[in-house]
Regions:
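N-terminal targeting leaders that direct proteins to extracytoplasmic destinations
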Residues: 1-70, 190-196, 200-211
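A broad, low-specificity signal for short, low-complexity segments enriched in glycine/proline
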Residues: 23-26, 32-37, 71-74, 110-114, ...
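Extracytoplasmic/secreted proteins, especially bacterial periplasmic and envelope-associated proteins
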Residues: 39-42, 46, 50, 91-98, ...
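Periplasmic peptidoglycan-binding/anchoring modules of Gram-negative envelope and division proteins
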Residues: 50-59, 63-65, 81-114, 185
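Soluble periplasmic/extracytoplasmic beta-strand elements of cell-envelope proteins
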Residues: 63, 70-76, 80, 110-114, ...
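Solvent-exposed coil/turn segments that connect beta secondary-structure elements
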Residues: 67-69, 76-78, 86, 101, ...
Length: 211
């Protein structure tokens, strides 16, 4: 069985049904919607674990968090963009394409796009670079599918990788800086998945397959 790295849980946050997800912080969006029913949570955890394994078998770097309810896929920025560029390249497009089917059933997933940089350059530069890059990825999803329930975040160099030993990966080598330049895609269960889990079965057929 493939082993997935477990990330630390996020703080609890209660979201109103009419809350605008685009007005929420990253932590707030990661914490909601909250799943309070144990049986419902069990079904979602099982479904998400299977999805995570499928991504891992396709050679994506995968983690799970929030009691296995949220999937995190990390893609190196070097596989999405040419150096210092803000246009998604052909390799990046191929890596992003599998996520289009996650968006074909609005409300099944909330997808959070979180772009990071190393600390090369000023904080203003790194923030602007990550903002342009995450907006380019958001626009790519908009042009090729849908951006309903897709929320972009640009964090500059403020959130370096934390490794499996809970150590911060410092920007003190070429390899470490490369690790910190990354896109994190969080797949958070949303209302449609929660409704299916409440009824008893989460059915992948509700997400249309690519032709």
């Amino acid at each position: 069985m493939a082993v997935l790295f477990i990330m630390c849980p996020v703080s609890s946050f209660a979201r109103d049904d009419d809350e605008d997800i685009y007005e929420l912080s990253l932590d707030e969006n990661l914490a909601t919607p909250e799943i309070k029913n144990d049986k419902q949570a069990d079904r979602i955890q099982e479904f998400q674990y299977d999805m995570a394994i499928a991504f891992k078998k396709s050679n994506y770097a995968v983690e799970v968090m929030r009691d296995d309810e949220v999937i995190v896929i990390t893609i190196p920025a070097s596989q999405l963009f040419d150096p210092n560029d803000t246009v998604v390249n052909s390799v990046g497009e191929a890596l992003l394409k599998p996520f289009l089917r996650m968006l074909k059933n609005p409300g099944f997933y909330k997808m959070l796009l979180v772009m990071h940089s190393d600390n090369t350059g000023s904080s203003v530069y790194t923030l602007n670079l990550t903002r342009q890059r995450v907006n380019a990825i958001y626009d790519w999803f908009d042009e090729n599918g849908s951006v309903d329930y897709v929320v972009p975040y640009a964090l500059g160099d403020t959130d370096p990788v934390v490794d499996e030993n809970n150590n911060i990966v410092e920007n003190n080598s070429v390899e470490n800086r490369k690790r910190n330049r990354r896109l994190e895609i969080f797949l958070v269960p949303e209302k449609t998945m929660l409704q299916q889990a409440k009824k008893g079965t989460i059915n992948m057929s509700h997400i249309a397959k690519d032709k």
